Every structure is written in structure tokens, then in C-alpha cells.
Amino acid sequence: MLNTLEPQPCETDALSPRLQRSTGSARVVMRRKADGTTALADLAQQGCAKAMLPRVHAPVPEVVFLNTAGGVTGGDSLSYRLDLEAGAQATGATQTAERTYRSSAGTGEMRVHLTLGSGARLDWLPQETILFDGSATRRCTEVEMAADATLLWCETLVFGRAAMGEALSRFAFRDDRQVRRDGKLVLWEPLTLDATHLAPRACLGGARAIATVAFLAPDAEAARDTVRRLAPEGVDWAVSAWDGKLVLRAFAPDAQPLKHALAQVLHVLREGASLPRVWQL
């Protein structure tokens, strides 16, 4: 029965001893200073995962994560963690689109863990994840936030590069997104996709790019009607809001119009703040 389901931590496949694998993890801690600004408190990184804090002319710092391996394939393991202490504010992003390449053996693993202390605000805006034919990937994103914290989260999936004439005939992607507010599970989105889900109208209906925007804040519902009115021609989306949450789901025939549409939504939910420079719109 549906009501007996419980979110489970992602399991990690054993790495194949026959092929070289990419492994990396990066962790950043941001802290609110006495003057009210947010600054780096701790940074640790290893392997192919890197974290950078570019110089920005804005009151809120940006934390940019990078996978120097250039993508994820079977047996790879990539982990990002971003912790905001009480009152801290930051924008998190990835330096470029993440690519999941053809897998010869095993599953590529990606993990993201985000924590928000009391009164903290995090805008987690990674660039799109591009799925390639033959890829096998599992991603798990876990968020732990205080009751009065604010989270803006945008996640985009692209099914092959349309400009390159790519079509996906075989792939496997599993995504598990969990948000706990004050210890209570308030958003859980398990997603399993393969090539059979691309064409049917009851699934993706031929869309080449999909996105989810989640906004969790005490007054999140107030933005619902404004976000609904932003829906552009050529991009299908629906918006719902309840219990301090706003969720938008969007479908488009190509990634570029979807990204431009998302930029308008994020501009509103970020109260006019510019997008991270790495988005390069």
C-alpha cells in the first residue's frame, strides 16, 4: 500500500575492481558573522569533487561545486554537502551541467546533503543534469532544515542533447529527494525513469527536459498565483502550494526554453536577486 512506503537511504553499489572509478566529496560550512554577513566557516574536499566561493558583488555568497571528472558513469561516486549555520544565507550551484555517461558496469552514485539552521536561507540551484544513452545513475538528495529556515530548490533533467540529435533508447535513472523540516518529513519525491517513460502522454509525453522547483518557507503559498501567471508559451507547468511549501513541475521540448522560464520563476522567488553567474543565460 502507498501509505506503508518509507523513504530509504540510497544504497551504494560495490565498485568494480576492473576499471578505474572517479570518487569525490566536498563539504562546505557557512556561518553568520556578527555584522550579519555570511562567510565560510569550513571547507573540505577530496578526489574529483571541488568547492569554490567566487567573488560576487552581492550580499549573499555563492558556493559552487565542481566535478573535475567531467561527468558520472557506472561505479563513480560523487558527494556534495552544504551546511548553513543559524542565520546564514547562501546560494549553492554547480559549475556546469552534470553529465551521466554510458555505463559499462555498475551504477553511478550522486549524493547531496543540505542542512539549514534556524533562520537560515539556502537557494540550491544546481545546473541541469544531462542523461546520456546507456547511462545508469542513482542520486539521493537529503535536506534537513529548521522550522523557520527557507529553502529554494531547482532541479532540472535533460534527456540527451537535442542540438546534437541525441536520442535515448536505453538508460536508468533513480532520484530520491527528501526534505525534513524540524525533523519531520515534509517533501519526499522518489523518481524512477527509463526509456519507456519518455514518449507516453501519461508519463513525459515526449518532453526532452523537465524541472521541479520547490520553495519551502513560512509564507511560500503567497507566491503561488504569481508563479502560475509566469507560465510561458511552449513550456507546460503546474504549481501547487500548501503547508509552507510551493512546488512547480515543468516540461519542455528542449532545455533552453525551460531554463529561461525557470529563470523568471527564480527571479520572483529570490525577490529580484540575480541568478548565479555560472548559469550563463
Curated annotation (Swiss-Prot):
Name of this protein: Urease accessory protein UreD
Listed GO CC annotations: cytoplasm
Pfam families (UniProt xref): UreD (PF01774)
Molecular function, one GO term: nickel cation binding
Subunit structure: UreD, UreF and UreG form a complex that acts as a GTP-hydrolysis-dependent molecular chaperone, activating the urease apoprotein by helping to assemble the nickel containing metallocenter of UreC. The UreE protein probably delivers the nickel.
Species of origin: Dinoroseobacter shibae (strain DSM 16493 / NCIMB 14021 / DFL 12)
Keyword entries, A-Z: Chaperone, Cytoplasm, Nickel insertion
Chief localisation class: cytoplasm
Region of interest (Disordered), ranges: 1-25
Family named by the database record: Belongs to the UreD family.
Cited InterPro entries: UreD
Function: Required for maturation of urease via the functional incorporation of the urease nickel metallocenter.
Taxonomic classification: Bacteria, Pseudomonadati, Pseudomonadota, Alphaproteobacteria, Rhodobacterales
Locations listed in the record: Cytoplasm
